[in-house]
């Protein structure tokens, strides 16, 4: 049986156990690097079974472009799993991200969207099929299938 290719997209410092890693940064421990535009260096198109994005969506400058790129690399029927802050807690999340990245980490390169963006609608317009949605506390979990 062929092993599934699962990638933690935006994994940064703390990747999901058992997943390959991919980020826009050039950390040496990453398996793949996203060029921030249309390519994931070192990855074949239509080869990914699952992209996992945890606390990443609010750091993506151009949602449509990035999701279009991920779709290009997903197999037909491949999954996109997103865990991110929900709309009701977004301002708190932005405050904490700014505190962490700008003051503690002194990192001005990481994008932080100042307002909540409807990434779900972007995915649906790109042809992803929503399989699951749950909002709890400050987070929401969504799962999509690539058509």
Q: Can you say where each PLM-predicted feature lies in the sequence?
A:
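A short His-aromatic
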Residues: 58-59
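A short glycine-rich, Lys/Arg-flanked "PGG" loop and its adjoining helix->strand segment in the class I
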Residues: 64-76
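Short alpha-helix
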Residues: 110-127, 133
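Conserved catalytic loop of SAM-dependent methyltransferase domains
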Residues: 129-147
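Class I SAM-dependent methyltransferase SAM/SAH-binding core
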Residues: 4-40
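A conserved beta-strand element that flanks and buttresses the S-adenosyl-L-methionine
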Residues: 52
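Conserved class I S-adenosyl-L-methionine
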Residues: 81-105
């Amino acid at each position: 049986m062929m092993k599934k290719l699962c990638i933690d997209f935006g994994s940064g410092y703390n990747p999901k156990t058992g997943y390959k890693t991919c980020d826009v940064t050039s950390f040496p421990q990453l398996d793949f690097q996203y060029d921030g535009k249309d390519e994931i260096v070192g990855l074949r198109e239509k080869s990914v079974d699952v992209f996992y994005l945890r606390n990443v969506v609010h750091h993506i400058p151009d949602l449509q472009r990035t999701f279009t790129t991920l779709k290009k690399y997903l197999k037909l029927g491949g999954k996109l799993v997103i865990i991110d802050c929900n709309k009701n807690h977004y301002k708190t999340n932005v405050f904490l991200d700014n505190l962490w990245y700008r003051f503690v980490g002194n990192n001005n390169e990481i994008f932080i969207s100042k307002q909540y963006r409807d990434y779900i609608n972007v995915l649906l317009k790109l042809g992803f099929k929503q399989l699951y949605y749950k909002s709890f506390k400050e987070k929401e979990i969504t799962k999509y299938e690539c058509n």
